[in-house]
Curated annotation (Swiss-Prot):
Positions of ATP binding: D33, G34, E35, R92, Q93
Gene Ontology CC terms: cytoplasm; ribose phosphate diphosphokinase complex
Subunit structure, as described in the record: Homohexamer.
Catalysed reactions, semicolon-separated: D-ribose 5-phosphate + ATP = 5-phospho-alpha-D-ribose 1-diphosphate + AMP + H(+)
Function summary: Involved in the biosynthesis of the central metabolite phospho-alpha-D-ribosyl-1-pyrophosphate (PRPP) via the transfer of pyrophosphoryl group from ATP to 1-hydroxyl of ribose-5-phosphate (Rib-5-P).
Domain of life: Bacteria
Family as reported in the entry's similarity comment: Belongs to the ribose-phosphate pyrophosphokinase family. Class I subfamily.
Record-given protein name: Ribose-phosphate pyrophosphokinase
Subcellular locations according to the entry: Cytoplasm
Amino acid sequence: MIFTGTANTRLAVDVVNHLDMSLGKMTVGRYSDGEVMVEINENVRGKDVFVLQPTCAPTNDNLMEIMVMVDALRRASAGRITAAIPYFGYARQDRRPRSARVAISAKVVANMLQVAGVDRVLTMDLHADQIQGFFDIPVDNIYAGPILLGDIWRRNFSNLVVVSPDIGGVVRARALAKQLEADLAIIDKRRPRANVSEVMNIIGEVDGRTCIIMDDMVDTAGTLCKAAQALKDRGAGAVYAYCTHPVLSGGAIERIETSSLDELVVTDTIPLSEQAQACGKIRQLSCAALLGETILRISNAESVSSLFAD
């Protein structure tokens, strides 16, 4: 059984349509002061239940929704509850810098999910793989790579080079470059403060080539747009960005529209705003089939990793 909240109903509908089933019957509402109210409207006793809900903006509202949904299902005696969170909010707060008195919010969210009654977590392209270790329950972190890679292959680009937007993304970019039999370039940047970045140097040859920037998410798009400009300044013929999660906060849309990017390709882990849908440089791919197949395999106790075998 698959239930969903209000964060990304369209994706949930696409997933159940792929599986030729219907969404679970549940009412999600708000009291006058904004508190979340959830009621399960069918029998779930002993059932294998999935709650599909990304914790995108409004992050705290959507996070609280999933907590209350899970609690309602647990109290209704669901047999097993899997939190399917395609976009895992708070994932960027995954460690404590040496001199900062800050929370490790990704761990806080992991604790909350487990206390609420989640038995298993399914997510896509976690910002930091080590977040899986914050849980004492199984976590399936699947990858949008097959979706993005398939789109690149269909477009039959020539003279490709895969670009990592920072040192931390090298592993992801290298894996894509290997599958495409393409070269790899790296953008060396320094980030003076949160959501502000400065492109410093490009490691690799991009002159006259088609550049594919690969990243797990695009937020304010500051890094992405500066990277595209730096690549064009170094002679790149075209710059395309492939990012799993379209957070697109702040002035991201305006930056993308006026940037040197030729196109930004994202998935539907997060629904696009009307402004983003109207942007001619943004194109969205569906991850419903991949999520649906993963949910089916988890429910049937089949291998998930074989979906991503080279």
